[in-house]
């Protein structure tokens, strides 16, 4: 039996509850919280996007699971939540990037793309016959040498971050960022920090098979996904550092 205060107000997306809540939007946020962990970090040398893409079965081909997407040459996105919803948002973002390039003969700005996407997300919270997207995105990119990192929300809210996380491991990851993030860290340090956060969120079950990492360097402004071998090298570094810290504490 549903709580009396929720009765009737969680059925229609366009109806506020007496205390000013849209329950369908809150339920969409819960779908994001149940997703795997995705990380975004802005550093002095560029943007790092990292995701946990663990599967529920050994029969699933790991290469078929995609949680990081290339939006444009200089922009990438990491997702969490309902996979199909995330794919639809990514396709819309790609279309917006293409429209901007055709119309203005230049790449789209990271903040402009993020705002356009969130404008659409917001429309899905106030129209009948639709539902909010049960997915959130971390959008990162470099434009004119300036790094930008944004987090979207099913409500259409848009927040710029230095480092952020979405999904089931958000709390653990954000605690690590609060403690270890530095504005002047280089790309390798940012990758190690992202892996440390994912390792904590996954209870130290991180492997090159279930982690995906993409970077966008300030100088090049080109989205690049790391190979499994490169990811494993960084994982080995993180594990080695954690073991050294444990030994020093003893």
UniProtKB/Swiss-Prot annotation:
Cell compartment(s), UniProt: Cytoplasm
Activity control mechanisms: The formation of the proteasomal ATPase PAN-20S proteasome complex, via the docking of the C-termini of PAN into the intersubunit pockets in the alpha-rings, triggers opening of the gate for substrate entry. Interconversion between the open-gate and close-gate conformations leads to a dynamic regulation of the 20S proteasome proteolysis activity.
The keyword Cytoplasm is assigned to this record: yes
A cellular component term, taken from the record's GO annotations: proteasome core complex, alpha-subunit complex
Task of the protein: Component of the proteasome core, a large protease complex with broad specificity involved in protein degradation.
Keywords: Cytoplasm, Proteasome
Protein's name according to its UniProt entry: Proteasome subunit alpha
Entry's Gene Ontology BP terms: proteasomal protein catabolic process; ubiquitin-dependent protein catabolic process
Source taxonomy: Archaea, Methanobacteriati, Methanobacteriota, Methanomada group, Methanobacteria
Pfam families per UniProt: Proteasome, Proteasome_A_N
Record's subunit section: The 20S proteasome core is composed of 14 alpha and 14 beta subunits that assemble into four stacked heptameric rings, resulting in a barrel-shaped structure. The two inner rings, each composed of seven catalytic beta subunits, are sandwiched by two outer rings, each composed of seven alpha subunits. The catalytic chamber with the active sites is on the inside of the barrel. Has a gated structure, the ends of the cylinder being occluded by the N-termini of the alpha-subunits. Is capped at one or both ends by the proteasome regulatory ATPase, PAN.
Gene that encodes it: psmA
């Amino acid at each position: 039996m549903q709580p009396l205060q929720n009765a009737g107000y969680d059925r229609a997306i366009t109806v506020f509850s007496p205390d000013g809540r849209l329950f369908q939007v809150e339920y969409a946020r819960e779908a994001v919280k149940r997703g795997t962990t995705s990380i975004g970090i802005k550093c002095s040398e560029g943007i790092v996007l990292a995701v946990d893409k663990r599967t529920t079965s050994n029969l699933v081909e790991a290469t078929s699971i995609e949680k990081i997407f290339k939006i444009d040459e200089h922009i990438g996105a990491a997702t969490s939540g309902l996979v199909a919803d995330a794919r639809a948002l990514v396709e819309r973002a790609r279309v917006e990037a293409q429209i901007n390039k055709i119309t203005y003969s230049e790449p789209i700005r990271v903040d402009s793309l993020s705002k356009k996407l969130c404008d659409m997300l917001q429309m899905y919270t106030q129209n009948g016959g639709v539902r909010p997207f049960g997915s959130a995105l971390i959008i990162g990119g470099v434009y004119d040498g300036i790094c930008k990192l944004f987090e979207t929300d099913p409500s259409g809210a848009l927040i710029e971050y230095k480092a952020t996380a979405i999904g089931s491991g958000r709390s653990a990851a954000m605690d690590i960022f609060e403690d270890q993030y530095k504005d002047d860290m280089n790309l390798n340090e940012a990758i190690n920090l992202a892996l440390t956060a994912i390792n904590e969120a996954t209870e130290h079950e991180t492997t090159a098979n279930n982690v995906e990492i993409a970077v966008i360097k300030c100088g090049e402004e080109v989205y690049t996904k790391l190979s499994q071998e490169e990811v494993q090298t960084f994982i080995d570094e993180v594990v080695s550092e954690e073991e050294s810290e444990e030994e020093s504490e003893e």
